[in-house]
């Protein structure tokens, strides 16, 4: 079972994420909520979630800063970004820090459910219930080409 932490500064949206998805049907349980990255770091220590669903733009500590702090602490939690900010800079930063998905608001509960199902399939394929520690990108890593493509698209479109 995946333990989920929902990080969103807008309470109505945060509660909507918690209530809109049939977490039990996805073999998940929401173990905590946080209104910003600082609260999320405390919640990670307390609940040890395996999945963090987070906004990017939040007061005190944004989602990118939170992911950097999680990486520095060796967190093995998967991260799904759920944000209204569709900037390639944000997407690129989130991917570099190990985000497994990037969803845009407004979203439908089906989109979030699909992202969780995709993650569960990835976990099953890896044969583990937690992600490997967020690794540094290695030279020659195929994901660099994805990041380069995103950079190109951001510059030319």
Summary of predicted features, one role per range:
Residues 1-3:
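Non-catalytic signal-transmission and effector/linker regions of two-component phosphorelay proteins
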Residues 5, 29-32, 101, 152:
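Structural signal for short hydrophobic segments within the conserved structured cores
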Residues 8:
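Conserved acidic carboxylate
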Residues 11-32, 46:
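Two-component/phosphorelay signaling modules centered on CheY-like receiver
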Residues 23, 41-148:
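CheY-like receiver
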Residues 150-157:
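Basic, amphipathic alpha-helical hairpins
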């Amino acid at each position: 079972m995946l333990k989920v932490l929902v990080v969103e500064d807008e309470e109505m949206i945060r509660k909507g994420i918690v209530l809109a998805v049939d977490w039990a049907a996805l073999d998940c349980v929401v173990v905590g909520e946080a209104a910003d990255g600082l609260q999320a770091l405390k919640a990670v220590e307390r609940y040890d979630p395996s999945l963090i669903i987070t906004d990017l733009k939040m007061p005190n500590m944004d989602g990118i800063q939170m992911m950097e702090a999680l990486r520095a602490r060796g967190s093995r939690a998967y991260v799904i970004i759920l944000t209204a900010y569709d900037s390639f800079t944000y997407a690129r930063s989130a991917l570099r820090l190990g985000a497994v998905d990037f969803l845009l608001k407004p979203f439908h509960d089906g989109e979030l459910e699909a992202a969780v199902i995709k993650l569960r399939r990835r976990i099953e394929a890896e044969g583990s219930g937690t992600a490997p520690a967020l690794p540094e990108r290695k030279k020659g890593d195929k994901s660099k080409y994805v990041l380069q493509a995103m950079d190109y698209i951001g510059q030319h479109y």
